[in-house]
Amino acid sequence: MVSLLLALVLSSVPSGQAVEQDYTLAYKKSVEQNKPLMVVVGAPWCPACTVLKNSTIMPMAATGELDEVSVAVINKDDDPELVEQLTKGEKMLPQIIMFTKNDTGGWNRQLLKGFQPKQPVRSLIRSAIAARRG
């Protein structure tokens, strides 16, 4: 009930971006717009994943704090092969993985594991943006 109410409230907020982006779409947007790619890996049966999404990711998207990154939210159960590749086999959920393009055309990877309040996510975003600007 609370998550439904939160979804309704957040859907009426005009600023920010949609959080539920498909990985392929988010990756493409990241490359085209030269933005860091933030991948949130979770599962619907994971309580910490639900709390992360509802109390950190969705409110940050609603206030525009995620506008400088391209965001993908991936359900571990829906795409286990992609999750295995992105997490490098790390099983802990949830995970926030930040990919930033480097000067050689490759991607640098930063990781937050477990539930995270807004401040560590803000720090991760700032770090990724600073790395992008070099």
Regions found by a protein language model. Give the residues of each.
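Conserved redox-active cysteine motifs that mediate thiol-disulfide chemistry
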Residues: V41-S55
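Electron-transfer interface patches adjacent to heme c in soluble/periplasmic c-type cytochromes
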Residues: E84-K91
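Non-catalytic, surface beta->alpha helical segment in thiol-disulfide oxidoreductase systems
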Residues: K91-G134
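Thiol-based oxidoreductase modules, predominantly thioredoxin-like and allied folds used
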Residues: Q17-Q21, I57, A61-E81
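N-terminal targeting signals for export/organelle localization
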Residues: M1-G16, G134
